[in-house]
């Protein structure tokens, strides 16, 4: 592996919003358009994957109760592996990556491996539901 992978790769821990494809942020769409790898969760609306580059590697890493496609540890290692290959990676998570999304664990793993990353916030369903219902928080 090339020791200067940090110069070529970056990971975007990206919130996909609460499910409505119209609620993803423009910055998240921009990240999807440039990523060579997209690792997405179960709660991500699959329609959002249309924003990925045609040649992007799309990997499912969904988890449901007692039914994981990958454990969190394996997801962390996968993100690190793809970044060390010199690829721009979007870790696409339902809602916001740091609100019930285990984004902090992934960020710690990236920091431990000295891999540059950026957090792209997403609209959480905890906020969106109240707004849709007209209930102020």
For every predicted segment, state its role:
Residues 22:
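Flexible active-site lid/hinge loop adjacent to a nucleotide/diphosphate
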């Amino acid at each position: 592996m090339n020791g200067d992978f940090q110069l070529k790769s970056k990971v975007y821990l990206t919130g996909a919003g609460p499910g409505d494809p119209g609620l993803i942020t423009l910055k998240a769409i921009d990240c999807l358009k440039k990523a060579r790898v997209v690792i997405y969760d179960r709660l991500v609306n699959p329609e959002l994957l249309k924003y990925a580059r045609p040649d992007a590697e799309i990997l499912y890493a969904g988890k449901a109760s007692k039914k994981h496609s990958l454990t969190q540890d394996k997801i962390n290692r996968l993100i690190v592996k793809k970044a060390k290959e010199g690829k721009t990676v979007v870790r696409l998570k339902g809602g916001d990556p740091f609100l019930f999304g285990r984004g902090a664990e992934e960020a710690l793993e990236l920091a431990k491996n000295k891999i540059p990353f950026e957090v792209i916030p997403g609209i959480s369903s905890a906020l969106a539901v109240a707004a849709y219902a007209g209930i102020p928080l």
